[in-house]
Amino acid sequence: MESLTQYIPDEFSMLRFGKKFAEILLKLHTEKAIMVYLNGDLGAGKTTLTRGMLQGIGHQGNVKSPTYTLVEEYNIAGKMIYHFDLYRLADPEELEFMGIRDYFNTDSICLIEWSEKGQGILPEADILVNIDYYDDARNIELIAQTNLGKNIISAFSN
């Protein structure tokens, strides 16, 4: 399993890492959505990473956690980016009622926080993003789950 670990000393570095990550994802053309699972405790920096990704590729507005709305949609550079937060999800079947599978059948990017709440409904992740924090610093580990995930990690080295 290919992986990459990055030390993130502060918020600025998290935003910069997010920008690079998004630039890599935007260059990929796929038949289906690129699935990115964002893992970490409350306050670990999942939404901050997402903000860095979105603002780094041109989103001008606020980026808020979709804790209450379940999903926030962004159309940037001709690509749909969906940011899901499943923290408040009581039952994975709720995802079926909202038509979740429609989000995954296009050339889009799906960033999913608390993916374990959608177990059995969500497709396999292409890449896992594990965020651990220590005081103000973070460690981000990217773990490839598919060949596409391996390509994403390889692109970080270029």
UniProtKB/Swiss-Prot annotation:
Any one Gene Ontology cellular component term annotated for this protein: cytoplasm
SUPFAM superfamilies: P-loop containing nucleoside triphosphate hydrolases
Alphabetical GO biological process terms: tRNA threonylcarbamoyladenosine modification
Location within or outside the cell: Cytoplasm
Record key words, sorted: ATP-binding, Cytoplasm, Magnesium, Metal-binding, Nucleotide-binding, tRNA processing
Principal location listed in the UniProt entry: cytoplasm
Binding site for ATP: E11, G43, A44, G45, K46, T47, T48, D136
Pfam annotation, one family: TsaE
Family the UniProt entry places it in: Belongs to the TsaE family.
Described function: Required for the formation of a threonylcarbamoyl group on adenosine at position 37 (t(6)A37) in tRNAs that read codons beginning with adenine. Is involved in the transfer of the threonylcarbamoyl moiety of threonylcarbamoyl-AMP (TC-AMP) to the N6 group of A37, together with TsaD and TsaB. TsaE seems to play an indirect role in the t(6)A biosynthesis pathway, possibly in regulating the core enzymatic function of TsaD. Displays ATPase activity in vitro.
NCBIfam families registered for this protein in UniProt: T6A_YjeE
Name of the protein described by the UniProt record: tRNA threonylcarbamoyladenosine biosynthesis protein TsaE
Originating organism: Haemophilus influenzae (strain ATCC 51907 / DSM 11121 / KW20 / Rd)
Gene name tied to this protein: tsaE
